[in-house]
Amino acid sequence: MARAAGLRALVGIEAAGRGRRVAASPSPGGTPAASRGLPGWPGFCGVGCGSSSSSSFAPPRMQARRAAGSAARTRSPSQSNGWITGGSASEDGRLSWDYSSFKGRRPSMEDRFSIKMTTINEQTVSLFGVFDGHGGSLAAEYLKEHLFENLVNHPELLRDTKLAISQTFLKTDADFLESVSSNPFRDDGSTAVTAILVGNHLYVGNVGDSRVVALKAGKAVPLSEDHKPNRKDEQKRIEDAGGIVVFDDTWRVNGLLAMSRAFGNRALKHYVKAEPDIQEKVVDESLEYLILATDGLWDVMRNEDAVSLLKAQDGPKAAAMKLTEVAHSRLTLDNITCIVLQFHHGKSTNSN
């Protein structure tokens, strides 16, 4: 994502998860949580703080424990000419998912994604996220490696999931900025949109303009709202903090960044926060699919169009590929990454 003038990009693609080989080119077709000290999070240090490993952050009773056996059935990884795709299904058959990530017309790949299945105190927790880097891939890569690791070690994850998500986003942002503080010539940033499943509750947290859209009762239902500088509440927040919102091919914070919240972006941090908006939904039988995607998809596709394409496909594998192919065919200029998550209510499924 080209967001700020003069910021460098890194070449290459790295993403969590595993996949399968595909063709080289597509066919046509609230109140902030404290970011310092983190009240209510005693003993949490966070990535980049001291020498402790992530496994030592939380009290022992809340340590994330891997479920007996494999948490998910996963296909072999594959990556070819800027593409990476793949998918898995949960052991209990209630979830299946696929992802498709493509460099597209950009010279470098700044998107990342992460998928994590774990068990905490006998409660299954499933975490899905996409991260769209700008000014380089350092921030997106850091989120891929650390955001969910921090979250599953938060001592309040099961009791107060919204608090845990908010504090983890802010802490991980502070940790990232500390990790790159010795390099004044880099000012990478990233979006994050996440879907966290704890029991039958879904928590969607977003920072920036990546998006989650649900197929619910046959209709497209957005579960996140893009953080754009010209959104009235965001513009007021930025201007109250002393920043400005100006139009330069699109609306930008201080004439630079085309989103109003992000991880990283040290030079604009006073205006561009990593505080997430969080939505909580109960998972019932009307919830069929989720699409998590970067704006390489949403810039050229309405929510309703994406859901229509999804409904015409046979499962998440075909849907993830089709969404990416169509976005590319519509001449998106950005990297494209999407995760398609399917809910199987009252039945089990085998991975493809």
Swiss-Prot record:
Q: What is the enzyme's main class?
A: hydrolase
Q: What domain of life?
A: Eukaryota
- By its UniProt entry, which PROSITE patterns does this protein fall under? PPM_1, PPM_2
Binding-site positions, Mn(2+) 1: D132, G133
Task: Detail which positions bind Mn(2+) 2.
Answer: D132, D295, D334
**In which residue ranges is the amino acid composition biased (Low complexity)?**
23-37, 53-75
Q: Which CDD domains match?
A: PP2Cc (cd00143)
Locate the PPM-type phosphatase domain: which residues? 96-343
Cofactor(s) this protein requires: Mg(2+); Mn(2+)
Arranged from A to Z, the UniProt key words for this protein are: Hydrolase, Magnesium, Manganese, Metal-binding, Protein phosphatase
> How is the cofactor bound, as the UniProt entry phrases it?
Binds 2 magnesium or manganese ions per subunit.
Listed under GO biological process in this entry are: signal transduction
Provide the residue span(s) of the region labelled Disordered: 18-37, 53-87
What EC number(s) is this enzyme filed under? 3.1.3.16
- Catalytic activities: O-phospho-L-seryl-[protein] + H2O = L-seryl-[protein] + phosphate; O-phospho-L-threonyl-[protein] + H2O = L-threonyl-[protein] + phosphate
Gene Ontology terms, MF aspect: metal ion binding; protein serine/threonine phosphatase activity
- Assigned protein family: Belongs to the PP2C family.
Q: Do you know which PANTHER family this protein is assigned to?
A: PROTEIN PHOSPHATASE
Q: In its UniProt entry, what is this protein called?
A: Probable protein phosphatase 2C 56
